[in-house]
Every structure is written in structure tokens, then in C-alpha cells.
Amino acid sequence: MALAQQLRSESDFEQLPDDVAVSANIADIEEKRGFTSHFVFVIEVKTKGGSKYLIYRRYRQFYALQSKLEERFGPESKNSPFTCSLPTLPAKVYMGAKQEIAETRIPALNAYMKNLLSLPVCVLMDPDVRIFFYQSAYDAEQVPQALRRLRPRTRKIKGVSPQGAIMDRMEAPRAEALFDFTGNSKLELSFKAGDVIFLLSKINKDWLEGTSQGATGIFPGSFVKILKDFPEDEDTTNWLRCYFYEDTGKTIKDIAVEEDLSSTPLFKDLLALMRREFQREDIALSYQDAEGDLVRLLSDEDVGLMVKQARGLPSQKRLFPWKLHVTQKDNYSVYNTVP
């Protein structure tokens, strides 16, 4: 939608900070195995200042944002002097294959974000809108997979300096071309079968960036054979530490969770995850309070209190600051019941 057609005026738009999101488009969906197995939408966001980045959002985050906006700006809002016609969010779906549901939602969610970011400046500057489109530390460290709906992002590369050329290239990441490839723009690297390409970066799952014969550009990874790969990236998996109580004693288990360390899970999701991991249905979840006593979790409010109390506590890298204690449901001996 052209700026002249948008509800906000051009002068208001020019006064926006450069880091405000002005467009967003879903690049792909990815399955995540966090507290639950779910699909997230990989969204490319463009800001007024021209920067681009990726964020990862679930449908329920769209739904939570829409609920807040309706309360604040909807026709029946009593909390704001300004109201407007908000875009329509695709409805919740309670049955069906998760991947198929996510795929079918993409066009409607793209339209939703386009219309949302075309609303007046006061909506764009709303704190919840800004947080939704903000790239968190968790977003920034994620490695995108295919990005099927976008061409790979590119960057201009300076020429290799003479000092760089002195380095032992046999130690550098490199690949051998299996087939001829002719780039369709100056950003793409053309080469012949048999050429050796020195690798500069991995754009995404399907595209690489490299240099050969004095030229630099991107190319599809399927056209080459890797001779020396990039060094292993640092593991970005987050872990949840659990203490499992049995008649024979207590064991410790760290569970891989693809969630932000600052996220707060739902009680039912935590319980389902623990039942799946320990293959037991008759379990109870607890956490340890500041006095060292176990407190049983029974609701989302209890989980929120656990997460809140753990903030600021020292913790290991990539380990959730709060810990779960998993006991048998009818075992109350682990609790300090003495007044």
C-alpha cells in the first residue's frame, strides 16, 4: 500500500523513529519443539530506517496482540480517546494437522500485518505493537532454515586485501563446483564445474556466499561439493533442568527446549512435556523457593510466580534460571509441612 493511501500522513510518518517496523512478510514456517511441539512463522521485518531482520512468532502471539489492540483501539474501547478499524485476524483452529493449519494461515497473516502497519502512527508506536515486531535476542540467534518465500538476503563484500591473500587458503572453508552456474544478477556468483570456491558465509539452508576467480557473490549450495566446511557453530539449544524423584533416589535430567530463556510456559504444556519425557502420568511438578522448600505447581499463576522469582538468580549459560522438581503425584513427603 502506497504511503499516500495509508491512513497516517506523510509528515507523521517522517517523524517516526528509524527502528519502527513499516512492513513485514512471512518468509517460512518452522517446527519448534519447545514446551510443546508447534510451528512458528518466520517473519522478515523492515524498519523505517531500512534495516531488515527476522523474528519468530506463534499464532497465539498474534492473537494476544490483537486482543490488546481491540481493548485499546477497538470501536468499543473505553480506554483510549482514539479508535480505529483494526484488521481482521484469521480465527483460531482447534482441529487439524498443525503444519497444514500454519501453511493456510500465511496469506491471511501477511494481509493482517500489512494492514496493521498501515494504521495511524499512534498504533505503530503502541508498546505492544513495537514489542511484537522487535527482534529479541532469541530471534537474533536463531538460524533460519529454507526461507522458501524470500530470496536470500545479500550483502556487498569488499575485495580481498593482499594481506588476506597471504593466508593459507587450504585452511579456509571451500567448495568445488559440481555444475556450471550462471548468476542472474551481479549479486550472484557465476562459476564453471571444477572451480574451487572459497566460502565466506552461509546465507541460509540453501544458499552460500563465496569468492572465486576474483569475483564474490551468492550461489545455491546444491551446485557444489563442500571440501572444507565452516567451523561448528556454537550450540544455541536452551535446556531445562529437571530433578526426578523416585523411590530409589533423585536423578537430574536436562531437557532440550526450543524456547526463549525469558519465556513463561503454560502449566498444561509443562505437565505434558514432563509426562512425555519421564513416561509417567501420575506426576506432580514443583519448584524450590528461596527458603529451599518445594512448592507444588497447580496453575499458570503458579508457573508465572516461579519464573518471576527466578529472575536475577545466577544460572548457567543456555539453562533456564528456574528448575522443575518432578515427583509422584501422591508423594507429599518431599514437602516441608512442618509449621
Curated annotation (Swiss-Prot):
Q: For binding a 1,2-diacyl-sn-glycero-3-phospho-(1D-myo-inositol-3-phosphate), which residues are annotated in this chain's numbering? A: 58-60, 92-94
Tell me which GO cellular component terms the UniProt record holds.
cytoplasm; cytosol; endosome membrane; membrane; NADPH oxidase complex
- Note whether Phosphoprotein occurs among the keywords: yes
Looking at the record, the residues that make up the SH3 domain are 170-229
Protein name (record): Neutrophil cytosol factor 4
Q: Which UniProt keywords apply?
A: Cytoplasm, Endosome, Lipid-binding, Membrane, Phosphoprotein, SH3 domain
Q: Where is the PX domain?
A: 19-140
Q: Which organism is it from?
A: Mus musculus (Mouse)
Q: Which GO terms describe its biological process?
A: phagocytosis; respiratory burst; superoxide anion generation
- Quote the function comment for this protein: Subunit of the phagocyte NADPH oxidase complex that mediates the transfer of electrons from cytosolic NADPH to O2 to produce the superoxide anion (O2(-)). In the activated complex, electrons are first transferred from NADPH to flavin adenine dinucleotide (FAD) and subsequently transferred via two heme molecules to molecular oxygen, producing superoxide through an outer-sphere reaction.
Q: Which Pfam families match?
A: PB1, PX, SH3_1
State the annotated membrane topology for this chain. Peripheral membrane protein
Self-association and partners: Component of the phagocyte NADPH oxidase complex composed of an obligatory core heterodimer formed by the membrane proteins CYBA and CYBB and the cytosolic regulatory subunits NCF1/p47-phox, NCF2/p67-phox, NCF4/p40-phox and the small GTPase RAC1 or RAC2. Part of a cytosolic complex composed at least by NCF1, NCF2 and NCF4. Interacts with NCF2. Interacts with NCF1. The NCF2-NCF4 complex interacts with GBP7 (via GB1/RHD3-type G domain).
Where are the Phosphoserine residues found in this chain?
315
Where in this chain does the record put each PB1 domain? 237-329
Q: Which residues form a coiled coil?
A: none
UniProt-annotated location(s)? Cytoplasm, Cytosol; Endosome membrane; Membrane
Tell whether Transport is among the UniProt keywords. Answer: no
Write out the domain note: The PB1 domain mediates the association with NCF2/p67-PHOX.
